[in-house]
Amino acid sequence: LEQMIHYAEAGGCRRAHLLDYFGEAYPAENCGACDNCLNPRETWDGTLVAQKFLSCVYRIREKSGFGVGVGHVVEVLTGASTERIRKWGHDSLSTYGIGSGHARAEWAAIGRELVRLGLLSQDPERFNILELTPAGRDLLRSRKTVTLTRPVAVAGEEEPEFESKSKRSRS
């Protein structure tokens, strides 16, 4: 299911993504035929939100000694007051509530994109616990720019509001 979500939300060439899944390489960056190549998704500077998300994952692991999934990280970022957050002391983290300006669905989409970008890993054998990858740790130390893809609005849903202006990707 997670891989289907990643496929649906990915901003790159779908042909290349499918071939990669089956162990083949697509020689071009753009097939010119899939929905993403015909209508590239908007991108935006997601550096600040990526740093917040990655920092939250790091601080939860450091405080608790164990990892958690995307949902719990989102709850901490948005300042939710759940029994688990209070029990584990995650309401005392510096990242608690720093993302309250965004909806939970937005944070969940950001978390999934950080996994796709290789900044976080998920272990399906361990309830999809998030772990910082070496690239994610490097990003926290170096403050490199992170470009995220704006999610496509689903019929009947409002389009998410992000804090940075977006620009149309022409890859």
Locate predicted features.
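Accessory DNA-binding and partner-docking regions appended to nucleic-acid-acting proteins
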Residues: 1-3, 11-19, 26-171
